[in-house]
From Swiss-Prot:
Keywords: ATP-binding, Cell cycle, Cell division, Cell shape, Cell wall biogenesis/degradation, Cytoplasm, Ligase, Nucleotide-binding, Peptidoglycan synthesis. This is UDP-N-acetylmuramoylalanine--D-glutamate ligase. Gene3D superfamilies: Mur ligase, C-terminal domain (3.90.190.20), Mur-like, catalytic domain (3.40.1190.10), NAD(P)-binding Rossmann-like Domain (3.40.50.720). GO terms for cellular component: cytoplasm. Pathway: Cell wall biogenesis; peptidoglycan biosynthesis. ATP binds at G129, T130, N131, G132, K133, T134, T135. Its EC number is 6.3.2.9.
Amino acid sequence: MFGDRQRPMVLVLGLGESGLAIARWCARHGCRLRIADTREAPPNLAALQAEGIDAEFVGGPFTPALLDGGIDIVGLSPGLSPLEPALAALLAAASERAIAVWGELEFFAQALRALGTSGYQPKVLAITGTNGKTTTTSLTGLLCQRAGKKVAVAGNISPAMLDRLASAIDETALPDVWVLELSSFQLETARTFAPDAAAILNITQDHLDWHGSFDAYAAAKGRIFGATTTRVLNRDDAAVMKFAPAAGAADAARTVTFGLGEPTRDGDYGLSRDNGIAWLVEAIDRDAPDETTTTRRRKRDGAHTPDIAHKRLMPVDALRIRGLHNAANALAAFALARAIDLPAAPLLHALREYRGEAHRVEVIATIDDVDYVDDSKGTNVGATVAALDGLAQKIVLIAGGDGKGQDFAPLVAPVARWCRAVMLIGRDAPALRATLADTGVPLADHATLEGAVRAAAELAEPGDAVLLSPACASLDMFRNYAHRADVFRAAVDEIAIDKGATP
């Protein structure tokens, strides 16, 4: 997989989960290794040493001198921003010396290409987006399993792609389908990755400190597509639809869209409402032959006007995951699985089966007809907007934390529409208050999450939801978003005990 290089020397930058996976993979293939981390003793250093991986470790600031001594490839961990001055200087020096810079995804793509020479040709599905990646990735994996395929789910969702590939090789159990959750960080260094089908779920402001601008962030998301990849795009998101080919382009037939409205193009997906019931539907051409959508589109001449009908797939209420945003995620997962020609029937059964992921618009209790919803994973504005619009009921919102420099303005309309009140916590509560001041919704500041939950419970009325969807990172008050969720759940348990209810 390293071309003509014999025992290439690889510099791995950053010893997080992906960096450790790159180091393991390179050691497995006989590479000489130098590993650098800005920390003198990163947590995974002990694991590296315990596994007996022969590598030179260098702790401290990154400098171009790390490239000396015959480095052939730089393996870049996804958590490291290429805009950070010291790293930017090192990467510029690598470019001047024509040293390749690969992330874990590029190592994975090269590995699959090498395995392909021995006849291994799996299907690869990939998912990215600001929000909904983990839910859609897990759901897509389940759909493929229920269709009878051996499936590996990896990437940003964990485990690392290279670790999962290594274990599959060792167990002689290479999967039929890879389903990969990919972050913008992972996609930034993608060069030859070309999945069979890939979805962009949405693009809203996030990680701008890492990428430098929204346009750069969106461009990284777009690297998920190869030249022949079927594109699964959210037509309700203008930033996503910039990746749609022009109508007459050669690859337009390989583009499928999904959204919350009725689809109007053959093979697209959406929602249709009839007699008060919302359905997941597929648009079909009544006059089309019994062929795949892509084949029909390729054969169609300009004179044919499709006679579009909506084929009902299942009622939205049959999904166990709450919210219209999750209906969109379900459509994306279904579209990905259909893009590799998996049969519809087992996919629809799997959609009904899926229960969702922890801390993602998860109803954890209903007390006195008030739902308590854990969306602690909602660490950016787009996630909270999706949660508010998706639940579509009166809500007492708990929000705040480390805003990461985001613009909170997109929260104004959904807060004004859905919120009975907003409880503000964390470092950037003042910025949130300033943004939401003109919504007409009562705002209250709280020093602790526990206090915010108690106050929210007092304000909520039967039929409401108390929603923890912070729109912010958690590290100003908590170890991580899971710790924040644990504190929320404990506070809800206390309310249940006080009211004599079972959470």
